[in-house]
Amino acid sequence: MNWDGLYASAFERIRDNIGKVGNVLLAYNTNIDAIKYLEREDLERRIGAAGREEVLPYSEKLPKRIESVPQLLGSILWSIRRGKAAELFVESCSTRFYMRRWGWDELRMGGQVGIMANLLGGVYGVPVIAHVPQLSRLQAELFKDGPIYVPKVEGGKLKLVHPKEFKADEENCIHYIYEFPRGFRVFDFEAPRENRFIGSADDYNTNVVIRPEFEEHFGEIAEKTELAIISGLQALTEGNYREPFETIKEHLDVLEGKGIPAHLEFAFTPDETVRKEILGVLGKFWSVGLNEVELASIMDVMGEKTLAEKLLAHDPVDPIVVTKAMLKLAEKTGVRRIHFHTYGYYLALTDYRGEFVRDALLFAALAAAAKAKLGDVRNIDDVVKAMDVPVNEKAKGVEEALTKEYGMENGIAEVNGYQLAFIPTKIVAKPKSTVGIGDTISSSAFVGEFALR
């Protein structure tokens, strides 16, 4: 197949039509990312100082949250050993102080909402309304220029302003990102691919603290909205999920009542009770986006233990197993679209049909490759600069398996009453950063679909 030709065509169509997309509501997590590029000698020294025998058990199994330095270092090792991302809440004040003293190499916009706001509003020119739990001066400065808005209430009236015009000096919400390249070695472990571990060290995003503007004026905000992307539920626990979930359910009911398609951007959620709660409200969403670790964690709470294990058994992950898991999730919840993204390929299972689903995936993959290649995408025309990045050769086996099992043609197949769309991604050999790649993929694909409708 001429995938490069399909990539070029998809980009042109979405670039020409993305201006049709109206306001996209983004909630709930925005923060500041403090990025540290790991160095072998430094990490080995820190593990030695913390006690190697104390650290290594957490590289086998992640804790639910981080309460000590050995848990932090072991969790970083867990990600390195597997080349997989993970994010955990840092509860311990002494560990937060340790991370602050360890320092960072750069500060960037963080949180799924913040990253997607800068991409959709600052790069694509799609107007967004963002939920920002704390609008510090530094947080506001990290937003790009463009149609990015936050609600502000003055004299009892709601208006939308750019974050830089909000003029508040609230707290800094900092998350620490520990990045490593493919082949990164520490002791006898080697990273099979580039990725990162995230230590969340703020109490607003992790408790999904919802701003009063969103509590009191959500109906009015929703009136101004055409699409919604919900994220940030991953740090909730059995102890703190009930209050925010009540508000979130109310928000979902409002969106559903107004016929506004909402996408849930899933993320690694350690707490089983919270995963079950998310599963319970998934039917209120149009769409959900996840990777193999996240899909396996959902299969686990659905009682599909064997399927969960199979999802993590092979690299690249078996597309037939992924499809079976997506079918089970769609049939159980009624969610209309499931977007699966992994290193090397994407799949979308939808209860509707059309090549635009595949083309939106292609646009998303090109945007992700551009972000990996350039570090920062300044405008939509920067996306096309990734056209020279090669299509993943290993995905040929994935395509062959899907063709054999489902009779896939041109990246599209009919499976059990659903359409399955497939694309191979473009792989940047030495990415400048991996932070925000997943958010770039999911928001570009979701909004890209509606640009082509």
Swiss-Prot record:
GO terms for biological process: carbohydrate metabolic process; chitin catabolic process; glucose metabolic process; glycolytic process. InterPro entries: ADP_PFK/GK, ADP_PFK/GK_arc, GlkA, Ribokinase-like. D-glucose binds at residues 33, 87, 111-112, 175, 439. The lineage of its organism: Archaea, Methanobacteriati, Methanobacteriota, Thermococci, Thermococcales. Residues 1-453 form the ADPK domain. Pfam families: ADP_PFK_GK (PF04587). Binds 1 Mg(2+) ion per subunit. It is found in: Cytoplasm. Catalyzes the ADP-dependent phosphorylation of D-glucose to D-glucose 6-phosphate and glucosamine to glucosamine 6-phosphate. Involved in chitin degradation. This is ADP-dependent glucose/glucosamine kinase. Belongs to the ADP-dependent glucokinase family. Its EC number is 2.7.1.-, 2.7.1.147. GO terms for cellular component: cytoplasm. It catalyses: D-glucose + ADP = D-glucose 6-phosphate + AMP + H(+); D-glucosamine + ADP = D-glucosamine 6-phosphate + AMP + H(+). PROSITE patterns: ADPK (PS51255). The active site is at 439 (proton acceptor). The keyword Glycoprotein does not apply. It comes from the Archaea. It comes from Thermococcus kodakarensis (strain ATCC BAA-918 / JCM 12380 / KOD1). Disulfide bonds: none annotated. It is an enzyme of class 2 (transferase). Disruption phenotype: Disruption of the gene severely affects growth in chitin-containing media and leads to an almost complete loss of chitin-dependent hydrogen production. ADP binds at residues 291, 341-342, 428, 438. The keyword Lipid biosynthesis does not apply.
